[in-house]
Amino acid sequence: MIFLQRGMIALHRSKNSSVQNLVVQNLIVIWSMWRAREAPSSRRRCRFCDAYGPGYFFIPGTETCLKIGGRVRTEGEWYDAYNPNSKNGTLWHTRAELSVDTATDTEYGPLKTNTVVRWDWNDGNSTSTKLLFANISLGGFLVGKADSQYNNYMGYAGNVINDDVIYDGPKELNQLTYKYDAGNGFTAVISLEDSNSSSDTSSYGGAWQTGTGNHYAPDVVAGAGYKTGAWTLRVIGGYDSIVEEGAIKARVDADFGAFSAFLMGGWNTDGDKLNKYAGSYLNSNRSACPTNGADCGWGDWAFWTGASYQLNPKLQANAQVAYTDSKIFAATANVAWRPVKDLLVEPEVSYTNWDAADADQWAGVLRFERKF
């Protein structure tokens, strides 16, 4: 009897073992089928492109990296720092921008594109849409629409909103550009720029606009710079092929971490004329400028200086002062507050005096901007 009981127990254990083995085998099969089904999905998951900076990811099925970004901005303005005849005491302006960047690795370096579309909405149901930038770059070359290298290479004119009350150069134009970086602090740029395209054509005077009709020669911009430690020196020149005049700018930057400052000077080859590289946002077509619009340009020279100080991780103070041979004085100061990442709140106040127009203007801006 004891032998029979032991035999039944052994048989029962054998059956349990078989059942367990069968269950395990079935689980293995189910797991394998699940992994096989998931494998294609895993390959379709987003892959990031760390080589080109944050935000880039591979377009599925390609070796091209894509980055989508932009910003939304709304601001209230009190008078106009650029115009002593501004009639509106206040106005409200809202803007949205969408940027799309791509990058693909090639034997000549990254092949990149940059596209930015802008939408603006102003007081009085006024709205506009435009292609702000659209360009292709490879191996130091850039072709398409971008800001003039006369501005881009030099770093514009300070960390304030109204930074170009004293005109510092053209923006948003077609160009063929080559930039060189030696890797030891030395850089250089040369650019052929479309003489008939720019967002600022009303700033160069009537003679300039008359000359654009049958003109096809490009403008030429060339510059060089050197950076060592906290100091950077850059020089650039631009030749306006329509007016057959130009301008040169030189700039020194100092960056000591929390504190940075710059000094930039410009020379106009003919102080009695406006040209694309020494123009004016104040001319006889839009304000109180005298009949000779050049009186509201640089004259023979202009200079800009500015400084920024990081008060704490979320608060930065900025200031800029500019003056011209034609006795235009502009001063601006603001505070840039970033309460959270990618959100900017920026109040600013400006003062401008136009000696030739016997006029001055106080102006203010309160800006809210979210970048993504």
Sequence positions of predicted segments:
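Hydrophobic, lipid-facing positions within transmembrane beta-strands of outer-membrane proteins
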Residues: 94-98, 132-134, 172-176, 218-222, ...
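Repeated loop/turn-to-beta-strand initiation elements of outer-membrane beta-barrel proteins
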Residues: 107-110, 140-144, 184-190, 230-235, ...
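Residue-level signature of outer-membrane beta-barrel architecture
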Residues: 102-104, 138-140, 180-181, 226-228, ...
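Outer-membrane beta-barrel "beta-signal"
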Residues: 30, 339, 359-372
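N-terminal periplasmic/intermembrane-space "pro-region" immediately following the signal or transit peptide
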Residues: 1-69
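Outer membrane beta-barrel
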Residues: 55-78, 84-199, 218-227
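Detector for outer-membrane/organellar transmembrane beta-barrel domains
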Residues: 217, 222-330
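Transmembrane beta-barrel strands of outer-membrane/channel proteins
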Residues: 72-76, 115-119, 143-147, 190-194, ...
